[in-house]
A protein has these predicted regions:
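Conserved catalytic-core segment of NTP-binding enzymes
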Residues: 101, 121-135, 150-250
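Primarily NTPase-proximal linker/entry elements flanking Walker-type ATP/GTP-binding cores
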Residues: 1-91, 98-118, 126-133, 140-143
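Short glycine-rich anion-binding loops that position phosphate/pyrophosphate groups of nucleotides
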Residues: 146-148
């Protein structure tokens, strides 16, 4: 679908255009660049402004499939926005060791963590984290959630409940850049379930070309905020569409 859109735009840009001898490759490349940038066209999301202007804690909820890198992304956000006194909500009460993993991140980062027991209601964990942040004057709550899959209807229904009860200010879909064509289905599944607001692509350092960004942005027409480019807390890079397109054209 993304490729078809790019081809259509490319035809539109080239049909009827005079192409000088020896300039064909350059002209096609320029037209392709424009077509890909058009596919990734997105509204700028002012996350910093949203946090500052919210009357109370700004709630960001992280969603995604198992293994996409949600928990690490939560930690990276806590590091990046530490000046807002973030509180982490251990909303994944399903996966073994998920709470301990977040506890370790919170300890290293020097931020607070709100947790319940395994099997507890995720919606209640997030609710308590927001309440705790408000009482402490924290400006930001970062909520981890259990990894979903196509087949697990119960977990998807639970996610809808967590969103419905807590009304997050921002729902971020965390996607693995190495996913391949399955990225279409993941984008649609989550967007149809909870109306995703933005995207973070992980493992972008492993697959540097950036085709996943092109597919994700086009599939659900939502902005890509950051790329995960390593395992360190600071390895969260602001998304740059022009840079991605240049990588794809190399």
């Amino acid at each position: 679908e993304t490729a078809e859109q790019i081809c259509d735009d490319l035809k539109e840009n080239l049909i009827g255009k005079d192409i000088s001898r020896g300039k064909a490759e350059e002209t096609i490349k320029d037209a392709l660049r424009l077509a890909m940038l058009d596919v990734m066209k997105q509204e700028k999301l002012d996350l910093e402004g949203g946090i500052k202007n919210k009357n109370g804690p700004y709630l960001i909820m992280f969603l995604g499939f198992n293994g996409a890198g949600k928990t690490t992304t939560v930690a990276k956000f806590a590091h990046r926005y530490k000046r807002h006194a973030p509180v982490i909500a251990a909303g994944d009460t399903f996966r073994a060791a998920s709470i301990e993993q977040l506890e370790e991140h919170a300890r290293r980062l020097g931020v607070e963590l709100v947790k319940h027991k395994y099997g507890a209601d995720s919606a209640a964990v997030v609710f308590d984290a927001v309440k705790h942040a408000a009482a402490k004057g924290g400006r930001l709550v970062l909520a981890d959630t259990a990894g979903r899959s196509h087949s697990n209807v119960n977990l998807m229904d639970e996610l809808k409940k967590v969103v419905r009860i807590n009304e997050p200010d921002l729902k971020i879909l965390v996607l693995d850049s190495l996913t391949g064509n399955d990225i279409y289905d993941q984008c649609r599944l989550f967007n149809e379930a909870v109306d995703v607001d933005a995207i973070v692509l992980t493992k972008a350092d492993v697959y540097e070309k950036g085709g996943a960004a092109l597919s994700a942005a086009h599939t659900i027409k939502k902005p890509v905020l950051f790329l995960g480019v390593g395992q360190r807390y600071g390895d969260l890079k602001e998304f740059n569409a022009e840079e991605i397109v240049e990588n794809l054209l190399k």
